[in-house]
Amino acid sequence: MDFSLSKQDQLFLQMIREFAEKEVKPLAAEVDESERFPMETVQKMAKLGIMGIPFPVEFGGAGGNNILYTMAVEELSRVCATTGVIVSAHTSLCCAPIMEHGTPEQKAKYLPKLTSGEWIGAFGLTEPNAGTDASAQQTFAVKEGDHYVLNGSKIFITNAGYAHVYIIMAMTDKSKGTKGISAFIVEKDFPGFSIGKKEKKMGIRGSATCELIMENCIVPAENLLGQEGKGFGIAMKTLDGGRIGIAYQALGIAQGAMDETVKYVKERKQFGKSLGQFQNTQFQLADLQTKVEAARLLVRQAAYKKDQKVPYSTDAAMAKLFAAETAMEVTTKAVQFHGGYGYTREYPVERMMRDAKITEIYEGTSEVQRMVIAANLLK
């Protein structure tokens, strides 16, 4: 497997790294503290082409591959996990399913505005009674002439309230179970569509996480994504791709925490020498960085397989599982290395620890990833 980037892509990634350091990092603490969606950062990323990295130029994208895209998510998440998840949800959960399952007309209508960053995208699957069990959808859609009428609600939706376009899953035939779920492209201004409660969260606090409400929401029939009854398959395939993005988000958080910790233990002195001179510190850092590098290889392998258009569901699950749990371990130990300072907002590691936790939960909990891996091993 070749994970190398072209010279052009290397320059693009370097630009993203510099942008993250100069434009994103200085805002990270304030965005977290105020729970503010960083729209100014999104607009700057749009101008740089970050909002459409893995999509063809003909549809407004940057023409990159998934390895480049996920490396970009890592760089952003290394300094601000909020920014990383905004890009990941937009790219993997909204743009990607339209690219993979949309009609030529749908692609022409929506992708240029989404991949250019003029519009932000989101994805609506989770419901109050349909979390890990995504098949238990209660939102339903009834076809009436040239449109569908949607009723129901979604919760914990990333980018909600700022997104222009939402991929919504709804039951079109309750008697068929998962084969009765369909996918729809829903615009924010469609009649009957509204934003409900905004969640107050432990981490990624600048990321808008809200409820979606559909009360007799009118959706044109041409906005059916794929065929009726194919929505569950679209959702599962979309989540496979999304898990790679979240794995890279977790990787970025972990690497960011390692960077901060290494800097701290070099400077902090106890008993007449720096913390980094103690063998216990050295051994722990060595183990943690080894896990970070192992996670990096897993997530790059998953991204590579996606680019090669070969099955990658198990790879995505393993990457997300390992990267998320590594991020949680690294950030927890980073706080411990910082001692009392690590528990304060004077240093970013406490924010990183809070941000890391969600990577073990959304787009499939760690338990779900283990189920996916085991099921594919035993089939």
Regions found by a protein language model. Name each.
Residues 114, 129-132, 156-159, 173-175, ...:
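Short Gly/Pro-enriched turn/cap motifs at secondary-structure boundaries
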Residues 122, 136-140, 147, 165-169, ...:
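Conserved hydrophobic/aromatic beta-strand scaffold that supports enzyme active sites
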Residues 117-125:
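A short, Trp-centered hydrophobic/proline-enriched beta-strand micro-motif
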Residues 64-65, 133-135, 159-163, 177-180, ...:
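Short glycine/proline-enriched turns and hinge-like loops at secondary-structure junctions
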Residues 1-89, 101-106, 113-118, 131-134, ...:
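Alpha-helical interface subdomain recognition
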Residues 95-101, 123, 135:
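Flexible, glycine-rich active-site loops centered on histidine and acidic residues
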Residues 146-147, 151-195:
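A short core secondary-structure module
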Residues 136, 191-220:
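Flexible, small-/acidic-enriched active-site or ligand-binding loops
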